[in-house]
């Protein structure tokens, strides 16, 4: 097992429904430590850059519009095999297909409004953490 860092973003739908504490409880009870966290609004430009890999997809514009529709909570998580562990705690992208007891099954509303984003690989985690955090913001 390897100690890893991963990135997580609590999405506007969860924040509008006051679910930050519940999402954090899933993460912490699942074995992850929150080592950085901040709440803010993303600009359209930031959202477009962050989701650039999806730019050619049909859902890109609606994704950018959704993620900039309200505040988000940006997080750095730490733990043993944190990337896979976070993906397991989050559940499948589509809440209808996610397992019971996962964030997306229990709190998600739709594929887009599924309450949380998490890095899907080591490379993504490094890129996404660096996109929003500098090293001084990550508390060990």
Curated annotation (Swiss-Prot):
Keywords of the record: ATP-binding, Cytoplasm, Kinase, Magnesium, Metal-binding, Nucleotide metabolism, Nucleotide-binding, Phosphoprotein, Transferase
**EC nos:** 2.7.4.6
Enzyme class (EC, first level): transferase
Name of this chain's protein? Nucleoside diphosphate kinase
**Catalyzed reactions:** a 2'-deoxyribonucleoside 5'-diphosphate + ATP = a 2'-deoxyribonucleoside 5'-triphosphate + ADP; a ribonucleoside 5'-diphosphate + ATP = a ribonucleoside 5'-triphosphate + ADP
Active site (record annotation): 117 (pros-phosphohistidine intermediate)
Q: Where does ATP bind?
A: 11, 59, 87, 93, 104, 114
Which NCBIfam families does its entry note?
PRK00668.1
Can you tell which superkingdom this protein's organism belongs to?
Bacteria
Provide the taxonomic classification. Answer: Bacteria, Pseudomonadati, Pseudomonadota, Alphaproteobacteria, Rickettsiales
Q: Where in the cell is it found?
A: Cytoplasm
Q: Which HAMAP family match?
A: NDP_kinase
Q: How does it assemble?
A: Homotetramer.
A Gene Ontology CC term for this entry? Answer: cytoplasm
Q: Which Pfam families match?
A: NDK
Membrane spanning stretches = none
Annotated GO biological process = CTP biosynthetic process; GTP biosynthetic process; UTP biosynthetic process
Task: Report the protein's function.
Answer: Major role in the synthesis of nucleoside triphosphates other than ATP. The ATP gamma phosphate is transferred to the NDP beta phosphate via a ping-pong mechanism, using a phosphorylated active-site intermediate.
Organism of origin: Rickettsia akari (strain Hartford)
| One function term, GO molecular function aspect | ATP binding
Q: So which cofactors does this thing need?
A: Mg(2+)
Homology family = Belongs to the NDK family.
């Amino acid at each position: 097992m390897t100690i890893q860092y991963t990135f997580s973003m609590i999405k506007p739908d969860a924040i509008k429904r006051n679910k930050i504490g519940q999402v954090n409880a899933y993460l912490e009870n699942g074995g992850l430590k929150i080592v950085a966290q901040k709440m803010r609004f993303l600009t359209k430009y930031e959202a477009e850059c962050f989701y650039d890999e999806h730019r050619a997809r049909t859902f890109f514009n609606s994704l950018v519009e959704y993620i900039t529709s309200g505040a988000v909570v940006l997080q750095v998580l730490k733990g043993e095999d944190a990337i896979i562990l976070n993906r397991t705690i989050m559940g499948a992208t589509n809440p209808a297909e996610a397992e019971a007891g996962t964030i997306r099954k229990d709190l998600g509303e739709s594929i887009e409004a599924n309450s949380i984003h998490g890095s899907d690989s080591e490379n993504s985690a490094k890129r996404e953490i660096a996109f929003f955090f500098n090293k001084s913001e990550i508390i060990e």
